[in-house]
Curated annotation (Swiss-Prot):
Top-level taxon of origin: Bacteria
Described purpose of this protein according to its UniProt entry: Required for resistance to DNA-damaging agents.
Name this protein carries in UniProt: Universal stress protein A
Annotated source species: Escherichia coli (strain K12)
Quaternary state and interactors: Homodimer.
Post-translational modification: Phosphorylated on serine or threonine in response to stasis.
């Protein structure tokens, strides 16, 4: 099956480039579109009451770092990146919204094979939310 628009969900870890390479290798033979998305935790939702942190400054800095990392992934993809998206909130809902808006038909995401990922897997959440084809790529941390 030839996909028309592949969405790569990245967490901006060093392993994200593995996902980009995998998606590009699938897109190239069919001249499919490729887009990147990163979904950030909305830190203001994690805190209740008063805190001694300037969330506005912290979120601005995180947004700048995210933009820089996405730009670097896009530039080094070796293939045209159609959309570079960044969102915050519920991972599944943000992806569903992007899929509908940009008519995407495949989501490529990674799954870190570590202790914490066994407890709280983003991939498992997406399987129950996203209604297009998915490719889940097992990732190993670079130290291993």
């Amino acid at each position: 099956m030839a996909y028309k628009h592949i969405l790569i969900a990245v967490d901006l870890s060093p392993e994200s480039k593995v996902l980009v390479e995998k998606a590009v290798s699938m897109a190239r033979p069919y001249n499919a579109k490729v887009s990147l998305i990163h979904v950030d935790v909305n830190y203001s939702d994690l805190y209740t009451g008063l805190i001694d942190v300037n969330l506005g400054d912290m979120q601005k800095r995180i947004s700048e770092e995210t933009h820089h990392a996405l730009t670097e992934l896009s530039t080094n993809a070796g293939y045209p990146i159609t959309e570079t998206l960044s969102g915050s909130g519920d991972l599944g809902q943000v992806l569903v919204d992007a899929i509908k808006k940009y008519d995407m038909d495949l989501v490529v995401c990674g799954h870190h094979q570590d202790f914490w990922s066994k407890l709280m897997s983003s991939a498992r959440q997406l399987i129950n939310t996203v209604h297009v084809d998915m490719l889940i790529v097992p990732l190993r941390d670079e130290e291993e």
